[in-house]
Amino acid sequence: MRLVILETSDSVGKWAAKYVMKRINDFQPSADRYFVLGLPTGSTPLGMYKELIEFHKQGKVSFQYVKTFNMDEYVGLARDHHESYHYFMWNNFFKHIDIEPKNVHILDGNAADLVAECNKFEDQIREAGGVELFIGGIGPDGHIAFNEPGSSLVSRTRVKTLAQDTLEANARFFDNDMSKVPKQALTVGVGTVMDSKEVMILITGAHKAFALYKAIEEGVNHMWTVSAFQQHANTLMICDEDATLELRVKTVKYFKGILRDLDEGSPLEGYKN
């Protein structure tokens, strides 16, 4: 596992975008060999998406031969609902780049058979050759996608009933009306993300500091699902200073020292865990 500690949340978005651009360009995707990218929603990756859009406009990266798989989607929200993840991804990223719509994969929360939809999503990932780089964010309780505390660490894409804490946290997006908050979601499993060749997790803000501590300094625990990625061969966590507040000083110095040796701010050329 590698931890990259940067000054601000803006720095995290810029660094992550540079890394994604480098991974795509180094891969040299083509019509016969697509780069497969796993993507999250939420406020944390917005800065990364904005930077990638700029890189695309500048001609530094193309998404023509990129296939994407998103982590999750609410059950029962129309695709054009302003809180659906379809809407989020198209509005904040896809419509601004040169990706082919057929290469975008987002779970359908309105499918007639939700279990079949989840199984199809797993099949599509396999048919694409697996995910090259899966990007995620985490919640204050250490959840990734909708794999909330207590989720199986070998789980696959499935229907999840959302915890009360999640419903209450999401109410602010639905006029603070709990009756409007979707009670279920479709989500990739922890095992689904673990199958990817590389995982990059973005963590910003003091409110996620304890989750980062659990992910880095304590053992693997299904009550903190992000901790599972200690056992992935290529996990890269990118965080800001605020997110390190619960880490030991020795831990922070250790990872900062590695980054300094690799030229701080660069997209970790040739990094190895």
Swiss-Prot record:
Q: What keywords sit in the KW lines? A: Carbohydrate metabolism, Cytoplasm, Hydrolase
- Give the reactions, separated by semicolons, that this protein catalyses: alpha-D-glucosamine 6-phosphate + H2O = beta-D-fructose 6-phosphate + NH4(+)
**Which terms does the record give in the GO molecular function aspect?**
glucosamine-6-phosphate deaminase activity; identical protein binding
Q: Where is the active site?
A: 72 (proton acceptor), 141 (for ring-opening step), 143 (proton acceptor), 148 (for ring-opening step)
* InterPro entries in alphabetical order: Glc/Gal-6P_isomerase, Glucosamine6P_isomerase, Glucosamine6P_isomerase_CS, NagB/RpiA_transferase-like
Q: Name one GO cellular component term.
A: cytoplasm
Pathway annotation: Nucleotide-sugar biosynthesis; UDP-N-acetyl-alpha-D-glucosamine biosynthesis; alpha-D-glucosamine 6-phosphate from D-fructose 6-phosphate: step 1/1
Q: Does NADP count among this protein's keywords?
A: no
Question: What's the EC number here?
Answer: 3.5.99.6
Tagged with keyword DNA damage: no
Class of enzymatic activity (EC top level): hydrolase
Looking up NCBIfam families in the UniProt record yields: nagB
| Self-association and partners | Homohexamer.
Protein name (database record): Glucosamine-6-phosphate deaminase
